[in-house]
Amino acid sequence: MPSLWDYLNKDKKPVIKKVEPPKKKEIKRDIPLFIKYRPKTLDEVENQEQAKQILRDYVINYKKKYKGKALLLYGPPGTGKTSSVYALANELGYEVLEVNASDERDAIHIHHIVGEASKGKPLFHKGRIILVDEVDGLSGKEDRGGVGALVNIIKQSSWPIICTANDPWDQKLKKLREISIMVEFKRLSPKHVYNVLKKIVTNEKIKISDKILWDIAYKSGGDLRAAINDLETIIKSGIIDENFVKALGNREQEIDIFKALGIMFKTENLATAVSAFNNVDLEFDEIFPWLEENIPVEYKRLDDIYRAYYWLGKADIFRKRIIKTQHWRLLVYAQIDAYGGIALAKNKKYPGFTRYQPPKRLKLLAQMKEKLEKLREHVSKLREKLHMSKRDIIKYYVSFALKLKNLNKTVADKFLKAIGLSLKEIEEIR
């Protein structure tokens, strides 16, 4: 039986409400300013005119003029090395295959990634640039064969290979330097950094005083990436204030040992000489042999050389006392005697450029390390065949082969072939 409510509403049609699904909230994804304002063309890269010219010529004329050679871009961080490569690739319609040498460090990874990329053809681009970023990261025990593998790939590559480094003078990179065109990216001046910052705030319509932009530019130490990141920090904090900029502090810039030696040897000011090595990433004990090696390289007069070694000797006394007593407060006196004493040992400044040398003992250590690597490699090869311990192989077979080689090369060659080695391989570990 129908209810009273049904009777009263019998002529009314039911109202069906359309339920809208809830709208998805738009998530704003902020692109970092450094990425947003990365140069799109090579002309947009601030300064570095000579470097840009060499880079363009190398990539465009690689197959005609530069096949078998790499381009090694070096200089302080934030000077535009990586950005320049991407900007040129964008201009030419090339793809960039980037490998970070700090991540892909050994021969297997280098062969697998860079080796394959050096042969294949891009599907959607006119050409390819292989970028090995932070190639100075290829140093250390875990990187066996990494540089050697890269050098072999460069010699056969169908595409231009560009490497970047903050410090290209590492002994491990010697073979790479020999087949590379070295291109320096110089530290940017505050004016060049300011120009980029001004362009960003104008485009972003941000009100910020020129004084603050100049402060950021000076504090960056020529590192454009750091300056843009500092600008972004200030904008996002909402505190656009000179005191906030001061709170960010200055960026200490590492300098290489060669530059520090140049500052110390060329100055006649004690304070400049003593502070020359402040931003060098080496301990005093590691710097000491560099001083010892380069005094006669810089100084030509005997009395200057005598005085310089006299002060270095005084510093060495302090150094030995520190080792014996662990009184590290003496380090200051050792540094003053070493850096200040050597700088003020000369009667007058020597003009012109000096090519400083790494210590001979470092070269000898590097050579010894290379020979030990070869020895390990050959002993491992023999171990599979002879089923003996490494110690016994070196004691009985390798030492005998070395003696036999000096007595009779023909007999030595037959003996080595019988155990699976050659005269050339035994020469490598001599």
From Swiss-Prot:
Gene3D superfamilies hit by this protein: 1.10.8.60, P-loop containing nucleotide triphosphate hydrolases (3.40.50.300)
Statement: the UniProt record of this protein carries the keyword ATP-binding: yes
Database matches in CDD domains: AAA (cd00009), HLD_clamp_RFC (cd18140)
Protein name: Replication factor C large subunit
Nucleotide-binding found in the keyword field: yes
Subunit architecture: Heteromultimer composed of small subunits (RfcS) and large subunits (RfcL).
Function summary: Part of the RFC clamp loader complex which loads the PCNA sliding clamp onto DNA.
Highest taxon listed in the record's lineage: Archaea
Taxonomic path: Archaea, Nanobdellota, Candidatus Nanoarchaeia, Nanoarchaeales, Nanoarchaeaceae
Protein family membership: Belongs to the activator 1 small subunits family. RfcL subfamily.
Organism: Nanoarchaeum equitans (strain Kin4-M)
Keyword annotations of the record: ATP-binding, DNA replication, Nucleotide-binding
SUPFAM superfamilies (UniProt xref): P-loop containing nucleoside triphosphate hydrolases
Gene Ontology molecular-function annotations: ATP binding; ATP hydrolysis activity; DNA clamp loader activity
